[in-house]
Amino acid sequence: MSDLYRFGISLDRELIEAFDRHIKGQGYQSRSEALRDLIRNELLRKTTAEGGLVAGAIVMTYDHHKRELVNRLIDIQHDFHDLIISTQHVHLDHENCLEVIAVKGNAPDIEKLSSALKVLVGVKHLDLSLSSAD
């Protein structure tokens, strides 16, 4: 016997047609797959809002020629060492670097780390992506 649970929902025709167009454009094979992802995303938002355990990545680009920027980035990462699983550093060109920081911990702490990095002069772009850690 499967652990799957089947249920029915009632939706307006316009809403389900719009949903079907959306999920087709996203490449979903079925409504069930799309609904599972929507439910997971909503549960992740709840976990994040409640300060729960999450994992994710901070992806940033920066100008490594900016005075003291690299030292500040390293100092901040050391301040949050308990959240950082690993980092990957990529030289994009002579001036620009890409850094990917894998993180795991309580959502508010990871958001503090992300914010501390984002506001540094020389950081051109930073994006935080979180997922469930359980």
Swiss-Prot record:
Cofactor note: Binds 1 nickel ion per subunit.
Cofactor(s) the protein requires to work: Ni(2+)
Gene Ontology MF terms: DNA binding; DNA-binding transcription factor activity; nickel cation binding
Alphabetic keyword roster: DNA-binding, Metal-binding, Nickel, Transcription, Transcription regulation
Sequence positions that bind Ni(2+): H78, H89, H91, C97
InterPro entries documented for this protein: Acetolactate_synth/TF_NikR_C, ACT-like_dom_sf, Arc_rbn_hlx_hlx, CopG, CopG/NikR_regulator, Ni_resp_reg_NikR, Ribbon_hlx_hlx, TF_NikR_Ni-bd_C
Example of a GO biological process term: response to nickel cation
Summary of the function given for this chain in its UniProt record: Transcriptional regulator.
Entry's family note: Belongs to the transcriptional regulatory CopG/NikR family.
Protein name: Putative nickel-responsive regulator
Organism: Chlorobaculum parvum (strain DSM 263 / NCIMB 8327) (Chlorobium vibrioforme subsp. thiosulfatophilum)
Lineage of origin: Bacteria, Pseudomonadati, Chlorobiota, Chlorobiia, Chlorobiales
